[in-house]
Amino acid sequence: MKRFLLCSFALVLLYPAGIDMYLVGLPRIAADLNASEAQLHIAFSVYLAGMATAMLFAGKIADQSGRKPVAIVGALVFMTASLLCSRASEGSLFLSGRFLQGVGAGGCYVVAFAILRDTLDEHRRAKVLSLLNGITCIVPVLAPVMGHLIMLRFPWQSLFYTMSAMGIIVGLLSLFILRETRPARLAPRDLSRSSPAAESLVNRFFVSRLAITTLSVSVILTFVNASPVLLMEVMGFSRGDYAITMALTAGVSMVVSFSTPFALGLFKPRTLMLVSQGLFLTAGVTLSLAHTNTVTLFGLTLICAGFSVGFGVAMSQALGPFSLRAGVASSTLGIAQVCGSSLWIWLAAILGISAMNMLIGILIGCSIVSILLIFSVTPNRSVAEHEEIPYQSRS
């Protein structure tokens, strides 16, 4: 079991590392490539587009050919794309490398969740996904610090050499440590539980959890996207104050994420999901009424706590009905989360909604819709929480 957890954590970490590692070098990259920082900020959207593209195909391929091949290829693509970025001499080549980085990270991301669905029952899966969320929160704090230390002595290309090395490590783990987890077949007693209706992507329960997780990701990405404007322009924080504040909010996310597995031993998953949405609603009301920086910071802290306590549980429930199609389900969740959150941020920008109102709107909208879905759509107990998976290969 340890090998699956190690490999899943490593596969997921490529995604946030690809976002946060290079940001500290953005001014120098822009200067060397004769591009403005504003032009290179599109690299974030290009990276997400690459992830979404990979997710369109990676899940189905993982269900048909296995998790291990997709993990290896994804890591290889991420490694190669990182080298391409390091060799870029102009903006378009750099953006091409960023797109391919997203493709590699997206494939690995999908496989990681499919592996956890294959190997863990629902109760343990919810705990592990909460821990995974906590570990993922460490990356936005450590990656810029690591990038800063690297750039004290080396050029910006070294940031992408480091990411390439991460791709190599993940590839080696996938090649030599990871065992195939794709179910070869189900026992006769489980066939009815994994019928096409039970594993349909338009299953009412799956759609409800897809909506909840997509709205939750939209909340946290809106917070990340709006935070520079809120903290530095509206609240008057310096860059140093901004960095410290974001580190503290990430710390809150880590503490709550690492505490959630213990809370699952005391409370039902639905209770934690309701607490999560209650925190979102409270945060939205707090921010709408805030007149001081202290109250605003308290509202932002509630956002991090709310996401951390409920997201892993909701993801676990969403993947629960799928044994033979875990890859496709994971892909669908990833695509919806990436595209849904990007669509909201884009629409809000087009409509000229301020950063604060953008955040308040998604907080209140997410909480109301999600609470209604949690109460109205409950898990189908006829679907097994976990099936015993006979592995196709042990290599």
Swiss-Prot record:
It is found in: Cell inner membrane. Keywords: Cell inner membrane, Cell membrane, Membrane, Transmembrane, Transmembrane helix, Transport. The chain crosses the membrane at residues 4-24, 42-62, 69-89, 93-113, 131-151, 158-178, 217-237, 247-267, 271-291, 295-315, 328-350, 355-377. GO terms for cellular component: plasma membrane. Coiled coil: none annotated. The keyword Cell cycle does not apply. One of its GO terms (molecular function) is transmembrane transporter activity. It is a multi-pass membrane protein. Its main location: membrane. CDD domains: MFS_MdfA_MDR_like. Pfam families: MFS_1 (PF07690). NCBIfam families: PRK10473.1. This is Multidrug resistance protein MdtL. It comes from Salmonella schwarzengrund (strain CVM19633). The lineage of its organism: Bacteria, Pseudomonadati, Pseudomonadota, Gammaproteobacteria, Enterobacterales.
